[in-house]
A protein has these predicted regions:
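A short, compositionally biased
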Residues: 1-3, 32-33
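A preference for well-ordered globular domain cores
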Residues: 2-27, 41-171
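A short, surface-exposed interaction/processing loop segment used at functional sites
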Residues: 26-36
Length: 171
């Protein structure tokens, strides 16, 4: 195996580096006009420094996105839909608890689906309670992973810490 660097023949800017079979060195620069290739030794390559804070933040975002994907298995995604769910739950709990208050969301849905507001309220409360349990499981996994990433001291530990077994959250 040979180590090589491909560079712009006009500017000297390094374009890429790598390893190849002994007979393939000349082929490494044939991809574009103006590229040149040079065989180098391992000592010539320095590993680029990695910004661990940027890696950590990228992993946080990846964890959050994955958690949102899992949530979407149980509820309709979207912040406006989430607000409607909360409003319907508030109305449903008021109906179940015998409170007298307007129920525009439940009334509209009951009329559209042909069920009573009372039956719909019971169903909404049951679904909200089931969702709360799932949401708590998802949130615990999400926060645990982010806490592990925060404590990790190198990129390998960060990568391992960010792994979440979302399959724990049953359907």
């Amino acid at each position: 195996m040979k180590r090589f660097v491909v560079y712009d023949a006009a500017t000297g800017r390094v374009l890429r580096s790598g390893t190849c079979q002994d007979d393939d060195l000349d082929m490494q620069a044939s991809r574009a006009a103006g590229e040149a290739v040079m065989e180098i030794t391992a000592e010539c390559i320095r590993v680029a420094e990695v910004d661990l804070d940027a890696v950590r933040n990228a992993l946080y975002a990846k964890i959050d996105s994955a958690a949102e994907d899992v949530r979407a298995r149980f509820v309709t995604a979207g912040s406006a839909q989430a607000m409607i769910y909360l409003k319907k739950e508030d109305e449903a709990r008021a109906v179940v608890w015998g409170q007298s208050k307007p129920t525009p969301f439940l009334s509209a849905e009951a009329a559209a689906t042909g069920v009573t507001v009372a039956n719909l309220a019971a169903l909404v409360v049951a679904k909200a309670d089931a969702w709360a349990a799932k949401a708590a499981e998802i949130e615990a996994l999400r926060r645990r992973a982010k806490a592990r990433v925060a404590q990790a001291i190198n990129i390998a530990a960060m990568h391992a810490a960010a792994q979440v077994d979302w399959a724990e959250i049953g359907a």
